[in-house]
Every structure is written in C-alpha cells, then in structure tokens.
C-alpha cells in the first residue's frame, strides 16, 4: 500500500480528525525542528526503515520530541536489529529521560499468545518513557 498524502487526509476526514498535518520525509533525518512534538509513537515501522543503526533512528525520533513529551515505540527489537537495548535504555535515562521501560511484547501482551506466535513476533518490544 502506498500511503499518499491524499489517502492520509481522506482517512483523517473519515475519522473526524482535523488537528493533524501530513508530511513526507526521511525517518533518519526528520524534516522538523528540535522539540516539535508533544508525543511520538510508532507501531512496527522502524524495522522496515533501511539503515543498520536503529538506535540512531530512535535518537532522531526523540530529537523532535518536546521536553516532557511521551514516547512509545513498538517494534521487532531483536539484538541483531537494534543492538543492546538494555544499554540503550540506560543511555536514555542518563540523557535525562524518565520512566523509560522496555516491555517484552513477544508473547502476546496485546493479543492472544496463539496469534502472537502465528505472527512470529520474536523480539517484539515496546519502548516507552518521557523526555
């Protein structure tokens, strides 16, 4: 599926949402100023973005988050894709982020275990916290 700006705008209109703006950009170099957003979220997207350094991608996402803003990034965070995420959580805390948690969702935290196994969600984790 190609998510055109028109498709996104039509979906927002159909849902009655008017306080959004759609922009095309590069996830590795987001076209937004530092601290532009109150919250950032992603659900199973980052593993599809090219580039080997997913932690760098996460830091770019946090760059555009306002101080005090909330983040929730859900993805297939296997060590081969993301590196040592426990060390990354510590790094975020050292940078001043609060309530940072890495929640294992590979066994169906948000769905029946049978469905999670069928979807092969090994390495699935939810990174949450506040900047």
Where are the model-predicted features located?
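A short glycine-rich, Lys/Arg-flanked "PGG" loop and its adjoining helix->strand segment in the class I
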Residues: 55-67
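Short "lid" loop at the C-terminus of a central beta-strand within the Rossmann-like core
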Residues: 76-81, 107
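Core SAM-dependent methyltransferase catalytic element
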Residues: 96, 109-131
């Amino acid at each position: 599926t190609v998510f055109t700006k028109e498709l996104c705008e039509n979906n927002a209109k159909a849902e009655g949402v008017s306080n959004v703006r759609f922009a095309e950009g590069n996830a590795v170099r987001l076209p937004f100023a530092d601290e532009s957003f109150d919250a950032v979220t992603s659900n199973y997207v980052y593993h599809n973005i090219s580039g080997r350094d997913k932690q760098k991608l996460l830091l770019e996402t946090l760059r555009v988050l306002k101080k005090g803003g909330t983040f929730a990034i859900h993805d297939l965070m296997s060590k081969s894709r993301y590196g040592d995420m426990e060390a990354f959580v510590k790094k975020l805390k050292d940078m001043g982020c609060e309530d940072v948690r890495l929640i294992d969702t590979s066994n169906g935290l948000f769905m029946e275990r049978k469905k999670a196994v069928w979807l092969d969600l090994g390495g699935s984790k939810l990174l949450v916290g506040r900047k």
